[in-house]
Each structure stands twice: as C-alpha cells, then as structure tokens.
Amino acid sequence: MFTDNIKTMGTNEDNYNVTILIAEDEESNFLLLKTILKRHCNVLQARTGLELLKVFEEKGADLILLDIKMPEMNGIDALKEIRKKDTQIPVIMQSAYAFENDMEAARAAGSNGFITKLINIVELKNTISKFLPQITW
C-alpha cells in the first residue's frame, strides 16, 4: 500500500482521456483524492453542491466522486439535479459515516456506488475501475 501512495505522486498535465470531478468541501480529503488520482486522470474540484452543478455543466466529467455532506446543497440533492440532466454518468457517493439511510437515499437518488472515508485506496480504485476500466493504475 505504501508503494501505491508513492506511485500516485506527480503532476496533472490535463492530457488524460478521463476526467473525474471530486465534490468535496474538506480540502484535506480533496487533496488526498487528488494525490491518488492525478497520475491517472484529469481531476476537477467542486467545494459545494452548487459549485458541483456549475463545474459539471461547464466542463463535464466521466465520473463524479460526491460527498454526501456538502455546503449550500447536500450531495443527495446535487445528485438529483445531475440526474435530471445526465442519467448515464457514474456517481460514487462518499461519506465519513456509512449510515444505511444515507446509502439508501444515495441509491434512490441514482448513485452508482458508495465508499466510506477514510479512503481505502484499493476500494477506491476498484470502484472507479468498474465504471472507467480504461484507467490504468
């Protein structure tokens, strides 16, 4: 696992064929995800639910990692808005708390998956690979 962390260090040159939009209001959580992903795909950030909708509309993405607890608009409501415009994009919900009611609300809103924080790198990569098999880890 330590080598996984080292392997993901580097810069994002915006030349990958895949873009992942990370909707995360906690900067440390975003930086962790970005560090893991940036050598494999383009990474976009949204810090609020409303910013997520704007970034997605303006730039698009191939997959969204979406925190359930977001300011201005929570992740479930943001997902419902995304599903009104795009029913196909994979959306993986994240939460620090794996409450069954959160997972059920995420599924009902159209989530494609659910991961918990603290991030398990293997679980994250496996979940993303289900929807974006072209990413090479």
Where do the language-model regions lie?
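Acidic, metal-coordinating helix/loop segments flanking the phosphotransfer/catalytic sites
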Residues: 45-63
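Alpha4 helix (beta4-alpha4-beta5 surface) of REC/receiver domains from two-component response regulators
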Residues: 77, 98-115, 126
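Receiver (REC) domain active-site loop signature in two-component systems and cognate sites
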Residues: 70
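Non-catalytic signal-transmission and effector/linker regions of two-component phosphorelay proteins
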Residues: 1-21, 42, 122-137
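Acidic catalytic/metal-coordinating carboxylates
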Residues: 48-51, 74-77, 110
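Two-component/phosphorelay signaling modules centered on CheY-like receiver
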Residues: 26-44
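Short amphipathic alpha-helix used as the core "switch/output" element in two-component signaling
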Residues: 54, 76-87
